[in-house]
Amino acid sequence: MPARERGAVAFSLALFGILSTTALPSWAAETLRIGAIPDQNPEKLNRLYGLLAKELSQKLNVPVRYIPVSNYPASVSAFRTGGLDLVWFGGLTGVQARLQTPGAVVLAQRDIDAKFRSVFIANTKSGLQPISSIQGLKSLQGQRFSFGSESSTSGRLMPQHFLQQAGLKPSQFAGGKAGFSGSHDATIAVVQSGSYEVGALNEQVWNSNLKNGKVDTSKVKVIWRTPTYVDYHWVARPGLDKRFGTGFTTKLQQALLGIQPSGNGKTVLELFGAEKFIPASSSQYRAIETVGRQLGKIR
């Protein structure tokens, strides 16, 4: 064989070898891939889910890898297509994911998720006073208002639901619409800076930022706490038992429920703003699905 042909064959074989090893990463078939809605800043999420991956790997004796996503819809899409095996969803995104992925299983929620709340915050220069009832939300008409992510349960869906109960539409805010900051942390920032006069976000994130000194209470304050509703939960893809062995999904649930407030687990729970994870079921989220359909977020 001429030298040129031998070179071409060698190059083709080398290229095939590269493609065959990179088309499917070696960790993809054997690693549990976990993800979460990006509801806070990436630095905190990377730390939280990095620690959780380590905790689960030790409990399950399988490699666990955290794979971040760019936005809420991306978490639902990655779960549907198999890019993520286990995802920490909000109430709405969890319902969306399960409707798009038949056989998906709700595994757990935090001890705070069965009775969750959102808070409405206001810039102190807005002159807005504390609100004592849902009907009091009418006082926000004409204000610059920001939700968090468009697909957030605590930062958009439920706040809009309560606004609707008060008879206030997003078109009645300043500029004829509400803004979307993208995350709970960002909502605090845009209201605190005065870019928006009012915003709605996850109460747990607000309390965490307050505790860590990241809120200037001379510039922003809580004016209303919503009634309770069910929110975040862990959802697993179908087929994990086939991939990791019989009973794996149950073991995964037990691993989450078994995280203790000591050692690495203590930090994980603190970052989640919880004392423990508790069992959860899909039936708890029927009200969220109903509100999602009413507001056009589920079709």
Place the predicted regions along the sequence by residue.
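A bilobed periplasmic-binding-protein/Venus flytrap-type ligand-binding module shared by bacterial periplasmic
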Residues: 38, 118-130, 230-244
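A conserved helix-loop-strand patch within extracytoplasmic ligand-binding domains
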Residues: 110-166, 172
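A ligand-binding cleft/hinge motif common to bilobed small-molecule-binding domains
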Residues: 88-101, 164-165, 190-193, 197-217
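Short helix-initiation/N-cap motifs at beta->coil->alpha
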Residues: 66-77, 90-92, 170-189, 228-230
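An extracytoplasmic/periplasmic, membrane-proximal ligand-sensing/linker region
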Residues: 29-32, 40-51, 235-236, 240-299
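Ligand-binding cleft/hinge of the Venus flytrap
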Residues: 51-60, 153-180, 210-216, 290, ...
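Short beta-strand->loop
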Residues: 103-113, 174-177, 210-228
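Extracytoplasmic small-molecule ligand-binding "clamshell" domains
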Residues: 29-93
